[in-house]
């Protein structure tokens, strides 16, 4: 269950935008829940059959985001939500949301430019 955070108010409009236009830009203040609520709500809405990748600029932030989302589902990282950072990965065959760093995403694109199996990419902290 996702916590009751300010971003919850924007989720219906965000899901509608993603369903109708296939892309959206979301801006909200720090602590609103963008990082930990949006990917889970996208998954719940069934917006894609593929995995949801979320790009985090820092390794610590990537691990923390994945751990928080997994915890909110009552799971451990590597189940529904996982992460991949340099030197460490917690993903499994059932992972649907994967938090990655820039280096990991770059390698994924170099290996598979079409990102087969990926249905959505979220750029968190896009300003960085």
Language model regions located:
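Conserved P-loop/Walker A NTP-binding site and adjacent catalytic elements of P-loop NTPases
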Residues: 2, 8, 16-17, 22-128
């Amino acid at each position: 269950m996702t916590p009751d955070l300010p971003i919850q108010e924007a989720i219906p409009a965000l899901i509608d935008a993603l369903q109708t236009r296939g892309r959206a830009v979301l801006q909200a203040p720090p602590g609103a829940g963008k990082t930990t609520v949006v990917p889970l709500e996208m998954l719940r809405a069934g917006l894609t059959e593929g995995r949801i990748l979320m790009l985090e600029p820092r390794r610590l932030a990537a691990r923390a985001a994945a751990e928080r989302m997994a915890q909110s589902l009552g799971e451990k990282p590597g189940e529904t939500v996982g992460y991949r950072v340099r030197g460490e990965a917690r993903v499994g065959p059932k992972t649907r949301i994967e938090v990655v760093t820039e280096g990991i995403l770059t390698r994924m694109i170099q290996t598979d430019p079409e990102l087969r199996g990926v249905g959505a990419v979220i750029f968190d902290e896009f300003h960085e």
